[in-house]
């Protein structure tokens, strides 16, 4: 009995130490983000009041999306098929119309004085508000936004994404922390109902070179194991060479989506995907997929 008691005590101590370390890491990660957040907030200027354009119908869903339990194929969108890969690629802008010289905004100049890896700022009202960094795809899995070793990690842009070009598809990764840190808050799109989606359908992702808003068109739980029927290598679709490839990607993520939205997605739209682990299985990913608000649309409803 004394041996059993001692063993239980050791297990308790180990668990307690692990739990303390877990919350210490989260606290440090939040402090690192908070420091950058203060810098970012201080550099933001309120725009002059202007008339707000009426939102385009395709920028907001027109009906409450219904949660689905099993994937169903969606109707194929009728699009003009490009004759060549070059023709298809030309549907995306070759540069930033409002920033052809690729000038880094003052906000990010100040942020990069604290960490040169800062490339963007991601926010969803009442859901998340975090800096986005970029290096290789492993560093910020184990380092916080200040670059310090930390198991909580930080949000980071996939290493394949080149912000110097208006990349057709941006992917941001982050840990799914149980108490909501990093991308832990994204699980709300999975666990809550369609009303939550409707109230939090818009994403702001400002980068070194542009400020942009996106509207969510799908929320999907997918596999990254090629043997599974719901396998989707979302990270491999940085660019699209033809209509078939575009339809395959957009069609698959819509098919697997928890919601059926009225948000249309067309070639030439710039996509943004937020990716995090889903559950205990390392092969599962929760994806929140959005497309950029088009000129003339508004995220205001």
Residue ranges and their predicted role:
Residues 1-11:
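N-terminal Sec-pathway targeting helices
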Residues 12-301:
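Solvent-exposed, non-transmembrane regions of membrane-associated and secreted proteins
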């Amino acid at each position: 009995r004394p041996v059993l008691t001692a063993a239980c005590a050791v297990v308790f101590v180990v668990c307690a130490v692990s739990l303390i370390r877990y919350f210490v890491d989260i606290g440090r990660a939040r402090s690192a983000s908070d420091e950058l957040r203060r810098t970012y907030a201080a550099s933001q200027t309120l725009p002059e009041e202007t008339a707000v354009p009426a939102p385009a119908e395709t920028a907001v869903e027109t009906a409450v999306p219904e949660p689905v339990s099993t994937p169903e194929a969606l109707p194929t969108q009728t699009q003009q098929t490009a004759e060549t890969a070059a023709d298809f690629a030309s549907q995306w802008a070759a540069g930033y119309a409002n920033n052809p010289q690729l000038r880094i905004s003052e906000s990010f100049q100040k942020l990069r004085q604290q960490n040169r890896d800062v490339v963007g700022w991601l926010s969803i009202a009442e859901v998340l508000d975090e800096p986005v960094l970029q290096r290789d795809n492993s560093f910020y899995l184990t380092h916080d936004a200040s670059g310090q070793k930390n198991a909580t990690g930080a949000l980071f842009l996939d290493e394949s994404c080149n912000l110097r070009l208006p990349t057709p598809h941006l992917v941001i990764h982050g840990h799914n922390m149980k108490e909501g840190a990093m991308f832990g808050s994204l699980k709300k799109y999975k666990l809550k109902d369609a009303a939550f989606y409707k109230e939090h359908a818009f994403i702001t992702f400002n980068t070194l070179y542009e400020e942009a808003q996106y509207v969510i068109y799908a929320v999907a739980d997918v596999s990254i194991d090629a043997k599974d029927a719901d396998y989707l290598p979302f990270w491999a679709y940085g660019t699209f060479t033809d209509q078939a490839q575009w339809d395959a990607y957009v069609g698959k993520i819509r098919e697997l989506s928890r919601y059926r939205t009225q948000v249309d997605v067309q070639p030439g739209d710039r996509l943004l995907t937020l990716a995090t682990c889903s559950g205990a299985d390392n092969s599962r990913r929760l994806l929140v997929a959005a497309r950029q608000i088009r000129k003339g649309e508004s995220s205001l409803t």
